[in-house]
Amino acid sequence: MFGDPIRNTQNRPTTDFINVVKMQRGFDLPVQDRQQDGNIPVFGSNGALARHNVAKVQGGGVITGRSGTIGKVYYTEGDYWPLNTSLFSVDTHGNNIIYLAYLLKMYDLSRFTEGTGVPTLNRNKFHNEPIIDVSLLEQETFAAFVKQVDKSKLAVQKSLEQLEILKKALMQEYFG
């Protein structure tokens, strides 16, 4: 549908990365200060890793690793706290968050990594790089498809879990 966003195989219009989504470094939150009984997800470079009772960002966004784990991209549609090991979207310019998450996965931000010991991703290295510019209508169509696939995956997973429970019950009946 969109083609390779690095090579722009569909010859789509392009713009600077920062015009599609502006990223910023996350915020410090020491482990001892986290309120694990909170309902706000805390995102680090490797995804949601804790909970807290205060959000630093309202309304959802896209998160990727800045230090350590580079290249994985996550999104949330709710409030969250991005840690200092991550970069998060401070301005999506009205673009769809789900679309942006998949776009950034395919854009391969790890290409811009620096450092040998602990890899680091500096937003200034890619903010002015060209990236495809896709209409909001196409983004929304794509996001609806992703949501439907995720909903189907969840239904299949639930069915598998129910089958596993049934199997255990039958095994208990046969061998118990």
What is the predicted function of each stretch?
Residues G44-A48, H52-Y107, E114-H127:
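A short beta-sheet element
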Residues Y99-L103, E138-T141, F145:
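Short amphipathic alpha-helical coupling segments at ligand-binding clamshell hinges
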